[in-house]
C-alpha cells in the first residue's frame, strides 16, 4: 500500500482538482485498512470534477490484484475498460463493443453505468462484488438498481470485481460493430475533458440543445464548451474547477440540463 499527497488534477481526465491524500491499495486486506477512515474512491478520473480546494477524505485507488482479469471469470474493478473491450474482441467474445472509447476503469463504469447509445455497462454484467461494512458481498445486476448513468450501490460500497456476460461471436462481426461505434464517436474533442457533461433529456440530445442555443465556444478562464461537441467541456490548459462550475451554471441558466459528472467534495 502506498500513501502520498497529490494534486488530483494529475489523476483526472479533465486535468482539474486540488490536493488529497491518495491511498493506492493492491490487496483486499489493504482495502480493509484503507477504509477505516472516511474515504472516496478514484477510478480513471473520468466523469469527475474535483474542486480546487481538494478533498479532506482519503482517496482510494485500486491497483495490484484489483487490476487482474479473466474474461471468462472475475475481472478486477481497477482494470481499464478500453483494455477489456480490445481483449474481448481479440478473444472473439461479444458484449463490450458498445463501450468502446469510454476512458473508465471497470469499477467506475459500473458505478455510473457508463455507456453509449450502443449499450451500457449493466448489459454486460453477470455479477458484481462490492466491499461495504467491512466485508465483500456479491450481487446480481438486478439488485443494484441500474438506470441511465446511475446505480444504487450500498452506502459506501466499493466495486471490487465483476463477472462479465459475454458471448462467442465471429471476430469479424465484433470488429464491424466496434467500427460502427468508433465512427459515432469521431466528433468528440481531443482536448482534456471529463466526458459528456450533461445527461441527455428523454428523447433529446444535450449536445444538440447546447449547439442550438449557440453555446459552443462559450468560455470561462481556460474552461470552454467544445467547438466539436456541445456536450463536452474542455480544459484549454490551466482551467480551474471554479471556471468549470461557472460554465456549467451559465449553460443551466439557458437549459434545464442535469450535470452528469460526480463533483468532489
UniProtKB/Swiss-Prot annotation:
Keyword Cytoplasm on entry: yes
EC number of this enzyme: 1.3.1.98
Domain of life: Bacteria
Record pathway: Cell wall biogenesis; peptidoglycan biosynthesis
Localization per record: Cytoplasm
Active site location: 149, 196 (proton donor)
Chief localisation class: cytoplasm
Domain FAD-binding PCMH-type: start-end pairs: 15-169
GO BP of this protein: cell division; cell wall organization; peptidoglycan biosynthetic process; regulation of cell shape
Pfam families: FAD_binding_4 (PF01565), MurB_C (PF02873)
Reaction equation(s) it catalyzes: UDP-N-acetyl-alpha-D-muramate + NADP(+) = UDP-N-acetyl-3-O-(1-carboxyvinyl)-alpha-D-glucosamine + NADPH + H(+)
Gene Ontology cellular component annotations, sorted alphabetically: cytosol
Region (Disordered): 182-203
Required cofactor(s): FAD
InterPro entries reported for this sequence: FAD-bd_PCMH, FAD-bd_PCMH-like_sf, FAD-bd_PCMH_sub1, FAD-bd_PCMH_sub2, MurB, MurB_C, MurB_C_sf, Oxid_FAD_bind_N
Entry's Gene Ontology molecular function annotations: FAD binding; UDP-N-acetylmuramate dehydrogenase activity
Keywords of this entry: Cell cycle, Cell division, Cell shape, Cell wall biogenesis/degradation, Cytoplasm, FAD, Flavoprotein, NADP, Oxidoreductase, Peptidoglycan synthesis
Family label: Belongs to the MurB family.
Annotated function: Cell wall formation.
Protein's UniProt name: UDP-N-acetylenolpyruvoylglucosamine reductase
Native source species: Thermus thermophilus (strain ATCC 27634 / DSM 579 / HB8)
